[in-house]
């Protein structure tokens, strides 16, 4: 049976997403954009921003995989008791 996601859980997840997005945007912007003498985004700034985003996505994917591996190991080590 699939668990229902409540509206408050959805709001919480969305707030977490926005917080992560804002933090990522700020970090990549601060690292990559150095010249404010033109309105145009320079090619090196674009490349840097794309690399920053890719690095973040790879890092979060790796952490997620390790987290799943850890939980699998824990479940194998300590099996769940059956409900009677």
From Swiss-Prot:
Keyword Membrane belongs to the record: yes
Disulfide bonds: 28-52, 32-48
One Pfam match: zf-Tim10_DDP
Protein's membrane topology: Peripheral membrane protein
GO cellular component, one term: mitochondrial inner membrane
GO BP annotations, alphabetical order: protein transport
InterPro entries per record: Mito_inner_translocase_sub (IPR050673), Tim10-like (IPR004217), Tim10-like_dom_sf (IPR035427)
GO molecular function terms listed in the Swiss-Prot or TrEMBL record: metal ion binding
Main location: mitochondrion
Motif (Twin CX3C motif): 28-52
Assigned keywords, A-Z: Chaperone, Disulfide bond, Membrane, Metal-binding, Mitochondrion, Mitochondrion inner membrane, Protein transport, Translocation, Transport, Zinc
Cellular location(s): Mitochondrion inner membrane
Subunit structure, as described in the record: Heterohexamer; composed of 3 copies of TIMM9 and 3 copies of TIMM10/TIM10A, named soluble 70 kDa complex. The complex forms a 6-bladed alpha-propeller structure and associates with the TIMM22 component of the TIM22 complex. Interacts with multi-pass transmembrane proteins in transit.
Annotated family: Belongs to the small Tim family.
Function field: Mitochondrial intermembrane chaperone that participates in the import and insertion of multi-pass transmembrane proteins into the mitochondrial inner membrane. May also be required for the transfer of beta-barrel precursors from the TOM complex to the sorting and assembly machinery (SAM complex) of the outer membrane. Acts as a chaperone-like protein that protects the hydrophobic precursors from aggregation and guide them through the mitochondrial intermembrane space.
Protein name: Mitochondrial import inner membrane translocase subunit Tim9
Protein encoded by which gene: timm9
